[in-house]
């Protein structure tokens, strides 16, 4: 083994061990002492400083700035991966507000085998739950394996997407190539860009060919099928990504701008049409009432979420600008270097795509239920990324071969530094220690729920799991028939979308005291307003769900530490007027 390889092993070993120690400090039991970002940055700064010194001492050829950037990216990537690990555990209870719902929705694809009845397919994120359903092929796998599978999906799909994108850049320097891969990984997670959405663009990243437009059209259609099954606002994204590659790689030449635009227009119209047809087809096939899919268009818009607020202290607009301005700076410098040597139609094409996705992302972020991060700006951030790296690495094809201007190297490095630091800080600010209840508490909680459910079901009473329905999915609560209606997350969607017919049926069943037992999160009848995170969501849920339920049902048992509340019908004299 040569000396340089020995050095590489020393550097690799140090970075791996030290970054794992850093992750363990923030995510382990002592992480509760370092919840504030400032303390996390101080700890990170200490590790990074030592690592840069070791890198310089071990490999003197490294200049300080590249060594600093590489070090930041390595720590960020390993920490981001480490944040997934506390979620891989065997606790039967939901780890986040929506996690248990996700496993229940995934089980819908195998509902006959699991519950003995067929239930409606998922309304929310069908493709995510389709991917999450794969482990259900093997019956009775423990929940920790299902959790491991989703972590694998996050890392595998994101990694494949990044690999295909970076491959298009033809970066010959191996170290630079891996550095870019690591940076794009951090960039994607600042949204985050969800893995099940990325699958729709993988065909375009893999096979876009400016010289084979028919093949590209087929790839756009394939991606659009998946996009149509995934989310309404991602229907045009495969076509828009192909159009972005087209504007970056294909000259206008002598064809004229009308003929030039015809190709991306065909892709766009065809892709959106296919995605829309698939979405309509799934709505009909899923078993859901068609009106349920309309809630995405009737939800209230909370424009204040675009500015700093209790739900998202940074505000969607400011955080999006923060995440995107470094790349805009790099793009502006590269365009200046080229003498803006791209036809105005190509400028407008990319600009209009970015503007449409930016405005669309802001509108979706303002919908009630959203606005707590910038994940709805994912498509905007994606196209911006592609544009930036194509220009920076010289993959964009200018319309003529004018000499390049002198680069603003120092200014470019400043923008690159911020492009690394901003997603790194957003990454380090995520992830907290996950302290699970003791095994005895978990067993007692399950025993309590089982006893109350058995008693309620003894006389053919219905047991409604508003929350924690995955306890039935994974057999933690046994011999209790599934009541498929009114799962909490779907119920919240109907509340936020003001689906009056759905909510009227729910209220009628509650008034009729149709359920012998309701298992829910602790219900509160207090309005909280916008001074608390997700205050608007709380208030509509209180008005449409909590108050009607508490009027006709009374809590009989609170299962603390999880938290879970068991409710039974009130006696006639106790029902509110």
Q: Where are the model-predicted features located?
A:
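Membrane-interface helix-boundary motifs at transmembrane edges
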Residues: 55-67, 166-175, 208-214, 250-260, ...
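Hydrophobic/aromatic-rich transmembrane helices and adjacent perimembrane loops
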Residues: 369-413
């Amino acid at each position: 083994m040569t000396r340089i390889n020995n050095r590489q092993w020393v550097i690799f070993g140090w970075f791996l061990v030290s970054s794992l120690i850093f992750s363990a400090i923030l995510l382990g039991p002592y992480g509760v002492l370092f919840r504030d970002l400032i303390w996390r940055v101080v700890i990170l700064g200490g590790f990074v400083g030592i690592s840069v010194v070791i890198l310089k001492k071990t490999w003197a050829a490294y200049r300080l700035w590249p060594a600093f950037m590489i070090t930041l990216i390595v720590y960020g990537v390993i920490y981001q991966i480490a944040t997934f690990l506390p979620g891989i555990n065997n606790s039967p209870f939901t780890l986040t507000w929506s996690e248990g719902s996700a496993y229940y929705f995934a089980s819908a694809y195998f509902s006959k085998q699991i519950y003995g009845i067929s239930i409606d397919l998922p309304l929310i994120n069908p493709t995510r739950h389709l991917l999450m359903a794969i482990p259900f092929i093997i019956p009775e796998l423990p929940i920790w394996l299902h959790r491991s599978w989703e972590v694998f999906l996050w890392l595998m799909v994101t990694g494949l997407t990044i690999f295909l994108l970076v491959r298009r850049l033809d970066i010959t320097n191996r170290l630079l190539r891996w550095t870019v891969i690591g940076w794009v990984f951090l960039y994607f997670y600042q949204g985050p860009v969800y893995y099940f959405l990325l699958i729709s663009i993988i065909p375009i990243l893999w096979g876009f060919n400016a010289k084979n437009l028919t093949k590209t059209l087929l790839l756009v259609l394939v991606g659009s099928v998946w996009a149509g099954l995934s989310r309404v606002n991602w229907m045009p994204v495969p076509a828009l990504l192909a159009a972005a590659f087209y504007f970056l790689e294909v000259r206008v030449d002598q064809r004229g701008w009308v003929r030039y635009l015809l190709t991306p227009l065909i892709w766009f119209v065809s892709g959106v049409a296919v995605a829309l047809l698939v979405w309509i087809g799934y709505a009909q096939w899923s078993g859901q009432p068609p009106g349920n899919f309309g809630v995405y268009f009737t939800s209230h818009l909370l424009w204040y979420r675009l500015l700093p607020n209790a739900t998202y202290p940074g505000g969607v607009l400011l955080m999006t600008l923060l995440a995107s301005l470094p790349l805009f700076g790099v793009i502006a410098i590269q365009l200046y270097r080229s003498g803006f040597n791209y036809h105005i139609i190509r400028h407008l094409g990319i600009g209009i795509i970015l503007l449409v996705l930016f405005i669309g992302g802001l509108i979706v972020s303002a919908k009630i239920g959203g606005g707590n991060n910038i994940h709805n700006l994912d498509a905007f951030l994606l196209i911006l990324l592609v544009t930036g790296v194509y220009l920076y690495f010289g993959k964009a094809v200018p319309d003529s071969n004018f000499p390049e201007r002198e680069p603003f190297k120092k200014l470019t490095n400043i923008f690159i530094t911020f492009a690394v630091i901003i997603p790194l800080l957003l990454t380090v600010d995520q992830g907290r220690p996950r302290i699970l209840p003791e095994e005895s508490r978990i067993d007692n909680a399950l025993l309590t729920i089982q006893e109350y459910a058995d008693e309620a079901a003894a006389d053919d009473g219905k047991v409604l799991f508003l929350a924690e329905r995955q306890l039935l999915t994974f057999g933690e609560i046994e011999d209790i028939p599934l009541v498929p209606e009114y799962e909490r997350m779907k119920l919240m969607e109907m509340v936020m979308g003001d689906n009056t017919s759905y909510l009227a049926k729910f209220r009628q069943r509650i008034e009729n005291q149709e359920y012998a037992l309701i298992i829910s999160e602790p219900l509160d009848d207090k309005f909280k307003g916008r001074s608390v995170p997700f205050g608007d969501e709380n208030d509509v849920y209180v008005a449409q769900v909590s108050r009607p339920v508490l009027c006709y049902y009374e809590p009989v048992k609170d299962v603390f530490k999880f938290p879970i509340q068991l409710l039974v019908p009130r006696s006639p004299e106790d029902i509110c007027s």
